[in-house]
């Protein structure tokens, strides 16, 4: 049995979609916080079990009979370390033999503040005695494209990444890699630095938005403090705004760049380009 935490989340549902191509539904366990959101998974024959990252006992119960676990990092930045400890402890108690974990690109040397909890989780895995693999994911293209509608409306894309190169890929690309690692043999003990095949700057993103929309969009680089303040002014929670601003500054220092093409090698095809992602965005919104 293969289990996925956060199975109905933004990455998790793509992982299950990819897994279903090669693994029978009867061998997949979706661990979810809210089973009501997993009715479609249950209808496909997938086992749905309820457990919250904060409830070690429920996680231990949910992991009974599971051999392999994909630990998708919690969405609660600042609470990730204790929550991941719960999952790892539960996996150990339930007899899970292998864990794949979605970490952060070059976590051990990353300038991003986000790296701290990932490094802590990686150490927990090393100390757990369970065989594991690290999926050090780079940035999701969707992270930046979420700001595209506002940029098109105002003609300005704001950020604090300077000329930093961002080797992003889509969630579906990263999910395909996770599905392969969790379902195939031979990946145990590996550390995969995963990122898109081609890197781009926010100036290039603005140019691509201009090209495909016909509306002029320029990139305006802000200081970390000013970018965080701008995000808060449109309603983002303080913690999220500060994290995004810190990540942009990290990108300016090379924190979101990698040119190894490990991701495309792992999934067997090129990663989704920026132009393709922008095109998809417009098709969905139209």
Swiss-Prot record:
This is Quinone oxidoreductase 2. One of its GO terms (molecular function) is NADH:ubiquinone reductase (non-electrogenic) activity. Transmembrane segments: none annotated. It comes from Escherichia coli (strain K12). Belongs to the NmrA-type oxidoreductase family. Its EC number is 1.6.5.2. Keywords: NADP, Oxidoreductase. Quinone oxidoreductase that may play some additional role beyond quinone reduction. Potential redox sensor protein. Overexpression induces retardation of growth. Monomer. The lineage of its organism: Bacteria, Pseudomonadati, Pseudomonadota, Gammaproteobacteria, Enterobacterales. Changing residue 139 to A/I: 3-fold increase in the Km for methyl-1,4-benzoquinone. NADP(+) binds at residues 6-11, 33, 73-75, 138-143, 171. InterPro entries: NAD(P)-bd_dom_sf, NmrA-like, NmrA-type_oxidoreductase. It catalyses: a quinone + NADH + H(+) = a quinol + NAD(+); a quinone + NADPH + H(+) = a quinol + NADP(+). CDD domains: TMR_SDR_a. The keyword Phosphoprotein does not apply. GO terms for cellular component: cytosol.
